[in-house]
Amino acid sequence: MAKYIGPKCKLARREKTDLFLKSGVRSIDTKCKLEQPPGQHGQRRGGRMSDYGLQLREKQKVRRMYGIMERQFRNYYKEAARRKAATGTALLQLLESRLDNVCYRMGFGSTRAEARQLVNHRGVLVNGRVVNIPSYQVQPGDTVSVKEKAKSQLRIQAALELAQQNGWASWVDVDATKMEGVFKQAPDRADLSQEINESLIVELYSK
């Protein structure tokens, strides 16, 4: 699957918000000029953005935040539309239940990309078994842990230390000493970023 390997700040500046693509050791404001569009001098566009433009921009923002390509993101939307919960909420819950994202929430990586790499390199266990599929859907009650051989990696230790300082999400229960945690439940909408307007994504895909 193709993936974006260019500057992370460029994506954040395009969306004018922190996409959490870079390590949280330093503030995003010291790394990226979020108020300045990408380009040598910050390309300026006049006029009001169309409704379609707003919907597309929101979809791109969320897709990039979770590091997912278009086809897979659309498949998540289709799955969310089949669920009983509100489609937008179900979409976010599916994204949050990805193994790479759960590892990120537990502090096993300082970014989702870092957590995904740990999963790809067979450094993560789910209920005691190695799972190397980043999109694996973690279920409520599942225990996610760092493989014994990977626990000595300095970047994992640094990420956990940062997570301890910032605090963990309410839907995971983490034992930093053991480098393991329990995915208690899919998060409620109120627990997630209010900067995401998932209704715009639903409007875009429902056309």
UniProtKB/Swiss-Prot annotation:
GO terms for molecular function: rRNA binding; structural constituent of ribosome. GO terms for biological process: ribosomal small subunit biogenesis; translation. GO terms for cellular component: small ribosomal subunit. Residues 97-159 form the S4 RNA-binding domain. InterPro entries: Ribosomal_uS4, Ribosomal_uS4_bac-type, Ribosomal_uS4_CS, Ribosomal_uS4_N, S4_RNA-bd, S4_RNA-bd_sf. The keyword Nuclease does not apply. Keywords: Ribonucleoprotein, Ribosomal protein, RNA-binding, rRNA-binding. Gene3D superfamilies: Ribosomal Protein S4 Delta 41, Chain A, domain 1, RNA-binding S4 domain. SMART domains: Ribosomal_S4, S4. Part of the 30S ribosomal subunit. Contacts protein S5. The interaction surface between S4 and S5 is involved in control of translational fidelity. One of the primary rRNA binding proteins, it binds directly to 16S rRNA where it nucleates assembly of the body of the 30S subunit. Belongs to the universal ribosomal protein uS4 family. This is Small ribosomal subunit protein uS4.
